[in-house]
């Protein structure tokens, strides 16, 4: 996130609207001003716009953010435009307030917009809390994290440095992508819990199965159950054999009894058949009579149909005869109208000829009207051209007078041009001199600053060399001590190997009066001390080289400034035409500035006088061109006027000819039309030239022609229709008479045939034939009924004879005894089946339980082996290990190591190689694992101590380094949070001169990147080193914001 523009309205000491454009400030800027002017308020406004409150201990002053200088009726708000990657957003937040004319408090208002093209598009959110969530998702930092890594409030810049492990963990988890590690832990934990649950379930199932099947006595119980089951099956088999024998015997007796009962039923049915024989005989007679009447009915129906057809055709012939008589009467009436129709045809031809003459007269009248209009238009054009000619003559006279005046004014342009050029040369010479003077003054100031910096760096280099020499001497002394201690250690080891009366391996003596007895454990502290001194010496040597490189660079810059100053003196000598071997003093900047202003004023006046002469010259060209145009227009107007007058004379002659022609047509036309007495309108003589008059006459003639033509066509159409209809009716009547004769002959033939057939079938008349008819369904049903009756009677008679031959007359007396015996055997069989089913189920259950027991045992062993590694891995990842550290915490420790590595690069430069941050060694106390604490390693003392022991200035250096290291570490990760800004409120005043130089140098390095750094400080050296500033000017009516290099 990088701020682009901040707008304040009635916030803190800023009354009204104030805008800060961060894009015009460069990568690093300084906020300066008097105490209480409102410097910190700018950072508070940024935090308020994003999070709704200032950061740090100033979060409680949100009610005081509203300006006390503003009127109660005015609103107070903060608007921040910021970039996030390639996108630009704007957040607007209005403070809550209670207006003077209202009792209720106005709630806080918040909205977020995104830039689209040249406009802003508001991001739709239902509530303010939803908008704040969107802002948080964009920044990916809450207010606590923002004040620890982006905006370091006044007096609280060491928050992250001094935070405990829990607070650091919360901050780092949000800044770094540890979700994957946490997800891995959760996934391993879930799988471990699932595996443990599965194992517990299997163990419970195994205990239950062991209690149910008792695997120790399983085989004995199985053999007992199998023997009992076999015995029951043998008994069941014997019972089923006995039951089959008695059942067969009983079924034979029951079959004989059923046959006797069936014989009784058959005899009763045969008696019923004998009673139904007369009814079926009568039905057979009806069937025979219906079969004879069926062919006669078809013939009778045909005869009736022929009779009906004859009657219908006769009625149609009568109707057609009446229609033909009506058509003949209409034809006679049309023949009587033929003479009148012929007269109308001749009249139609006469009107057609008259229409041609009227159309000619109409065309002539139209031509007269058009020519009259053209003549009137030409007359108006001639009048207009005459007026234009008079106007152009007057303009020509006026332009001649104006040209005489401008000619006298343009005569002075050469003199004024010469004076203007001389002044331009003098001004260019003065500006070049002014530029050289200003550049020389800047180089003198830079050379002095660089000289002071070189002297300071020489002192630092000498100090670094002394430190390095001292560290080298300490290193040599420590090495000598280690060598001496190693010698003593060897002596102690050798002394411990000596035995009484045994020769010494060194001197060969058997007497050992004073063997070495020093403790050999003193070597390890010396070794650690030598390692620390070596590390310190390497750091000091590196720092000395860095200082020497910077000193060399500053000397080169100073030499460059001196060379540029000599070049400027040489250029000024050439400009003033002085001898380069003699010294030429560069004039004072103020004097040469006054000279430039004087020449500029004179040049402006000369330019105005030259512009007047040039303007007169330009104005002279325009009247000359206008005079030429006016004379050309005057000549063109005269020529066009002559053409228009000639055209008007020609039109007048043509108009006279057309009037003579229409007069001739008007004399001829009434004679032809009056002879026919058709055109009724009577017009005056002066209207004969009117187009409407001839148009009305033409329309009247055409109307009469259409009416006559329509009447004649209708007469011809009706006459033709009557002729055609009469011919068609005659042909139709003849055809129907032929059909009537054919039908009558067929009727007589069919009537004789039906009479002969009816006599042969013994029917007296047609009604008896109709009464004897039966439908096909009725006939089929009656025949099927008789056939079924005969077949059923024959079958029952044959079955009765067969059964009487098979059965006897005695009824067995032991049927009840057989039934009782069968019933007893059925009960025994059911008892045996129930016993077999119980034994089989018991045996199956026992076997199934034992198999489940064995399967469960195998599964438990397999699952135990499979889950062991998973459970162990889950315990290790979730902190159930020797160090009691979780996997995500281990990842955060790695990130913290990386942050401190970045931070130490800058901290060692600022502390001249003395301090570097170190992550505390992992340890476990009563409260658990403490792995995110930060310690400070002191290269001068070789000790490691808590960060809280640092002084104020040292704490500030460590906090700045840690904040920058945190930003560097985050930015190196793709997809991480982008930290493009860092805001520091005070803290530089606690640094000494050398530390301040180092801090400013590091900030200069950061300035070369794309990161923005804003600093609030009263340190004067920062104001000279940082070119871009925001100056807060304090007045008794509120503060004002000024940007740029203004002091």
From Swiss-Prot:
Keywords, in A-Z order: ATP-binding, Coiled coil, DNA recombination, DNA replication, Endonuclease, Exonuclease, Hydrolase, Nuclease, Nucleotide-binding
Binding site for ATP: 33-40
Disulfides per UniProt: none
GO BP, one annotated term: DNA replication
A Pfam family that the UniProt record links to this protein: AAA_23
Coiled coil start-end: 178-276, 305-332, 382-410, 521-547, 624-667, 698-729
Gene Ontology molecular function terms on file: ATP binding; ATP hydrolysis activity; endonuclease activity; exonuclease activity
InterPro entries hit by this protein: P-loop_NTPase (IPR027417), Rad50/SbcC_AAA (IPR038729), SbcC_gammaproteobac_type (IPR004592)
Similarity field: Belongs to the SMC family. SbcC subfamily.
Function according to Swiss-Prot or TrEMBL: SbcCD cleaves DNA hairpin structures. These structures can inhibit DNA replication and are intermediates in certain DNA recombination reactions. The complex acts as a 3'->5' double strand exonuclease that can open hairpins. It also has a 5' single-strand endonuclease activity.
Subunit and interaction comment: Heterodimer of SbcC and SbcD.
Protein name: Nuclease SbcCD subunit C
Source species of the chain: Treponema pallidum (strain Nichols)
Gene it is expressed from: sbcC
């Amino acid at each position: 996130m990088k701020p682009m523009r901040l707008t304040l309205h009635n916030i803190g000491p800023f009354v009204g609207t104030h805008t800060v454009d961060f894009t015009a400030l460069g990568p690093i800027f300084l906020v300066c001003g008097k105490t209480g002017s409102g410097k910190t308020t700018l950072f508070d406004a940024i935090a308020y716009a994003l999070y709704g409150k200032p950061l740090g201990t100033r979060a409680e002053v949100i009610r005081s953010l509203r300006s006390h200088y503003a009127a109660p009726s005015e609103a107070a708000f903060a608007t921040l435009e910021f970039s996030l990657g390639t996108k630009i957003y704007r957040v607007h937040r209005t403070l809550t307030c209670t207006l003077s004319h209202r009792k209720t408090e106005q709630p806080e208002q918040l909205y977020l917009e995104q830039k689209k093209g040249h406009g802003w598009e508001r991001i739709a959110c239902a509530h303010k809390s939803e908008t704040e969530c969107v802002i948080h998702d964009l920044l990916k930092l809450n207010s606590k994290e923002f004040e620890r890594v982006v905006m370091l409030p006044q007096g609280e810049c060491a928050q992250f440095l001094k935070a405990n492990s829990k607070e650091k963990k919360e901050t780092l988890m949000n800044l770094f992508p540890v979700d994957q590690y946490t997800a891995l832990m959760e996934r391993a934990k879930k799988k471990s819990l699932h595996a443990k649950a599965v194992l517990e379930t299997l163990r419970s199932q195994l205990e239950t199965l062991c209690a149910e099947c008792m695997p120790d006595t399983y085989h004995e119980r199985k053999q007992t159950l199998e023997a009992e089951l076999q015995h029951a099956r043998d008994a069941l088999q014997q019972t089923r054999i006995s039951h089959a024998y008695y059942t067969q015997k009983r079924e034979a007796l029951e079959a004989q009894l059923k046959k006797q009962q069936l014989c009784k039923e058959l005899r009763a049915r045969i008696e019923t058949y004998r009673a139904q024989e007369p009814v079926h005989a009568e039905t057979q007679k009806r069937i025979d009579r219906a079969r004879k009447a069926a062919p006669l009915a078809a013939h009778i129906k045909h005869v009736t149909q022929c009779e009906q057809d004859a009657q219908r055709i006769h009625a149609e012939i009568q109707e057609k005869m009446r229609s033909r008589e009506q058509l003949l009467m209409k034809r006679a009436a049309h023949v009587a109208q033929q003479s009148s129709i012929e007269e109308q045809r001749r009249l139609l031809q006469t009107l057609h000829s008259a229409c041609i003459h009227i159309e000619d007269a109409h065309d002539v009248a139209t031509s007269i009207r058009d020519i009259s209009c053209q003549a009137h238009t030409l007359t108006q054009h001639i009048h207009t051209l005459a007026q234009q000619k008079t106007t152009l003559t007057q303009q020509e006279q006026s332009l001649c007078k104006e040209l005489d005046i401008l000619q006298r004014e343009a005569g002075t342009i050469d003199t004024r041009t010469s004076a203007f050029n001389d002044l331009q040369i003098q001004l260019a010479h003065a500006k070049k001199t002014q530029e050289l003077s200003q550049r020389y003054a800047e180089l003198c100031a830079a050379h002095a600053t660089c000289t002071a910096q070189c002297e300071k760096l020489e002192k630092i280099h000498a100090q670094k060399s002394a430190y390095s020499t001292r560290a080298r001497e300490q290193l040599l002394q420590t090495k000598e001590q280690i060598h001496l201690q190693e010698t003593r250690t060897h002596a102690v080891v050798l002394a411990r190997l000596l035995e009484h009366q045994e020769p010494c391996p060194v001197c060969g003596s058997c007497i050992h009066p004073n063997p070495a007895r020093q403790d050999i454990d003193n070597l390890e502290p010396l070794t650690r001390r030598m390692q620390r001194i070596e590390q310190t010496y390497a750091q000091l040597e590196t720092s000395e080289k860095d200082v020497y490189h910077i000193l060399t660079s500053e000397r080169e810059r100073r030499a460059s400034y001196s060379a540029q100053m000599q070049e400027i003196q040489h250029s000024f000598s050439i400009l003033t035409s002085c001898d380069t071997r003699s010294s030429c003093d560069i004039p004072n900047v103020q004097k040469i500035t006054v000279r430039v202003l004087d020449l500029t004023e004179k040049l402006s006046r000369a330019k105005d006088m030259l512009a007047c002469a040039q303007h007169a010259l330009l104005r002279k060209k325009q009247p000359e061109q206008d005079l030429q145009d006016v004379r050309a227009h005057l000549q063109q107007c005269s020529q066009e006027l002559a053409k228009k007058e000639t055209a008007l004379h020609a039109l007048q002659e043509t108009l006279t000819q057309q009037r003579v022609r229409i007069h001739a047509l008007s004399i001829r036309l009434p004679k032809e039309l009056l002879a026919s007495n058709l055109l009724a309108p009577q017009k005056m003589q002066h209207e004969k030239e009117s187009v409407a008059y001839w148009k009305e006459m033409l329309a009247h003639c055409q109307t009469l022609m259409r009416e006559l033509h329509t009447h004649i066509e209708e007469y011809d159409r009706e006459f033709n229709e009557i002729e055609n209809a009469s011919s068609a009716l005659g042909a139709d009547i003849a055809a129907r008479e032929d059909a009537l004769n054919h039908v009558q002959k067929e009727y007589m033939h069919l009537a004789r045939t039906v009479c002969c057939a009816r006599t042969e079938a013994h029917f007296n008349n047609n009604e008896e034939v109709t009464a004897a008819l039966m439908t096909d369904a009725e006939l089929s049903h009656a025949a099927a009924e008789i056939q079924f009756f005969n077949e059923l009677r024959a079958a029952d008679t044959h079955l009765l004879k067969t059964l009487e031959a098979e059965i006897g007359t005695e009824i067995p007396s032991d049927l009840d005894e057989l039934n009782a015996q069968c019933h007893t055997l059925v009960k025994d069989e059911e008892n045996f089946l129930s016993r077999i089913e119980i034994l089989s189920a018991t045996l199956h259950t026992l076997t199934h339980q034992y198999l489940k027991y064995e399967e469960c045992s195998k599964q438990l062993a397999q699952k135990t082996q499979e889950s062991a590694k998973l459970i162990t891995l889950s315990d290790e990842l979730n902190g159930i290990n020797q160090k009691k550290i979780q996997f995500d915490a281990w990842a955060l420790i790695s990130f913290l190591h990386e942050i401190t590595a970045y931070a130490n690069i800058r901290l060692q430069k600022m502390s001249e190689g003395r301090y570097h941050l170190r992550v505390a060694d992992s340890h476990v106390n009563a409260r658990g694992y403490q792995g995110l604490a930060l310690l400070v390693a002191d290269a001068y003392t070789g000790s490691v101590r808590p960060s809280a022991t640092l002084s104020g200035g040292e704490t500030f250096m460590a906090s700045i380094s840690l904040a920058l290291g945190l930003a560097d570490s985050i930015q190196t990760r793709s997809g991480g949070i982008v930290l493009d800004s860092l805001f520091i409120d005070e803290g530089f005043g606690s640094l000494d001169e050398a530390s301040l130089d180092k801090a400013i140098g590091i900030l200069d390095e950061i300035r070369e990147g794309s990161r923005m750094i804003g600093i609030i400080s009263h340190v004067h050296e920062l104001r000279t080193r940082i070119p871009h500033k925001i100056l807060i000017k304090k007045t008794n009516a509120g503060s004002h914001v000024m940007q740029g290099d203004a002091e």
